[in-house]
Amino acid sequence: MKALHFGAGNIGRGFIGKLLADAGAQLTFADVNQPLLDALNKRKSYQVNVVGEQARVEEVKNVSAVNSGSPEVVALIAEADIVTTAVGPQILARIAATVAQGLITRHQQGNTRPLNIIACENMVRGTSQLKQHVFAALSEDEQIWVEQHVGFVDSAVDRIVPPSEAGSTDILAVTVETFSEWIVDGTQFKGQPPEIVGMELTDNLMAFVERKLFTLNTGHAITAYLGQLAGHQTIRDAILDPAVRQTVKGAMEESGAVLIKRYAFDPQKHAAYINKILSRFENPYLHDDVERVGRQPLRKLSAGDRLIKPLLGTLEYQLPHDSLVTGIAAAMSYRSEQDPQAQELVTLLAQLGPKAALAQISGLPADSEVVEQAVSVYNAMQQKLAH
C-alpha cells in the first residue's frame, strides 16, 4: 500500500502517519518545513512517546518526505493507494490544487486503481470540503473520471498531541496520549477499504463527528478559556480546579443531552465517555498549555464549531445551556499576544461592544436571550478581572 500524508507535524507523525506505517504502508510525508523533511529523509524513522499509565516508546520506520509544493508530490498522488491530510482546516484549500494536479496526472497515466483520500482534520466533513476545492481545479471530464475512481472519505479524529517540549533536541520525536480514535465513513470508499489497525468504519459518521466535537473539543476549549481566566498554565491544572471542572463537565453534559436526543445515544455510555475525556484532560504526562488550546477564538466561536453548534442544539430541543453560555463568555475573554485571532477579538469587542461582536462572530441574533446571557456573564468576568 502506497500512502502519501500531507502534514508532517505532530498529529501527522504521532497519529495518522504512525497508523499508516504500522499497517505496513510505504509512507511519504509531504510538508513545507524543510528541516523536518531533511531529518525524515536522512533518518527514515522517528520516535513516538506514548504517555499515560502504560508509557512506551514506539519507532516508526521506513518513511520518507517530500516538499508539498514539489513535482514529486504530483507523481506520488498519481501512484498512491491512500492520501491523508493533517494540515489544519485553513490549509486544506491550499493543497487542493496540488491534489487536483496529481489526479489529472493519474488519469493521464491511465491508473484506474482505486484511490481514497481522507482529510483527518478537526472539522465536520473536512474531506467533502477538500473535494469541493479539488473539483474547482478540474475540468468536467476530469471530474467525471475522478468521481469513478477516487473516494473522498470523511473522518473524525481524536488524539491529544501537544507540541514538542521546548528544549527537545530531537526535531522528529513526538509525544502522544495513549487514547486514539480514527473513525471513517465506510460508505465513501472506492474499492475495498484498506486494512489499517486503529481506523474504524461507520455508516453513521455524523454521530461520531458531533460526539467528538461536542464533548472533547467543547470541553477542551472551555477548560482552556476558564483555565486562563483563573490563572492556570496547563489543561491539567485547570481541570483539577473544582470550579472550572464543574462548568466544563456541565457544558459537556448539556451538549451530551443534544447528542442523546439527536442520535439516540445511550445516556450511561455517554456519561462514561464524558468521564473518560475528563481523565484525559488530567493526564499528568501531557503538558498542554491553556493558551495553545484556546487559540483561534473567532473560529471556535463560529456557528458550526465547538461552542455555538452545541448551543444551537440546546435551543433546537429546548434544553438547558447555562454552562455552555459560561464557556462562550470565557472564550470572549481569551487573550493572547501570540494569536492574531485573539487580537482581532479584542478589536471587535472594543469597536462593536460585546453584544454586537458576539452576534457577528457567532451568527446568533444580537437581541436573542442567549446573547444577552453570554454578555452578562462576560461583563461579570471582566469586572472580576478588573478588581
UniProtKB/Swiss-Prot annotation:
Binding site for NAD(+): A3, L4, H5, F6, G7, A8, G9, N10, I11, G12, R13, G14
Gene Ontology terms describing biological process: mannitol catabolic process
Pfam families linked to this entry: Mannitol_dh, Mannitol_dh_C
Reactions catalysed: D-mannitol 1-phosphate + NAD(+) = beta-D-fructose 6-phosphate + NADH + H(+)
Oxidoreductase recorded as keyword: yes
Tree of life domain: Bacteria
InterPro entries associated with the record: 6-PGluconate_DH-like_C_sf, 6PGD_dom2, Mannitol_1_phos_5_DH, Mannitol_DH, Mannitol_DH_C, Mannitol_DH_CS, Mannitol_DH_N, NAD(P)-bd_dom_sf
Disulfide bonds: none
Gene Ontology, cellular component aspect: cytosol
UniProt-recorded name of the protein: Mannitol-1-phosphate 5-dehydrogenase
Organism: Yersinia pseudotuberculosis serotype O:1b (strain IP 31758)
Gene name as annotated: mtlD
